[in-house]
UniProtKB/Swiss-Prot annotation:
It catalyses: a (3R)-hydroxyacyl-[ACP] = a (2E)-enoyl-[ACP] + H2O. It is an enzyme of class 4 (lyase). This is 3-hydroxyacyl-[acyl-carrier-protein] dehydratase FabZ. The gene is fabZ. CDD domains: FabZ.
Amino acid sequence: MVFNVVEIQKILPHRYPFLLVDRITHLEKGSYIEGYKNVSISEPVFQGHFPDHPIYPGVMIIEGMAQAGGVLAFESMDNATQEEIANKVVYFMSIDKAKFRSPVTPGDQLVYKLNVIKNKGAIWQLDAKAYVDDKLVAEAELKAMIVDK
């Protein structure tokens, strides 16, 4: 399954400047998702991080991976209607084993790859990795829960 940004906005509540997934390129319900974000110098975060040496913040990479995980969780809800999904939200529960291996700069394309470690009911545990040009730049274990708004 492929989702463009308009379709992603139908799934996630996030909007500019905090929608951090531009496209989903691969999705296997209940097990795997891959997508990307194009990092642009025109993003507001670069006004302060850092004006003379722009580096995309690691917390934004984590959030982008989490948003991709949210798409995976929502799209894996087979028996839910669009209306039911619209009344749900994904809450972060924990971030473990986070590592930042290389800086991300304007012009990079961040590729998110997430595998499900465990899913029990509304709780999802994900192995999340982010790449630029096939090089691992960040990774973490993410845990989240789908709840009613």
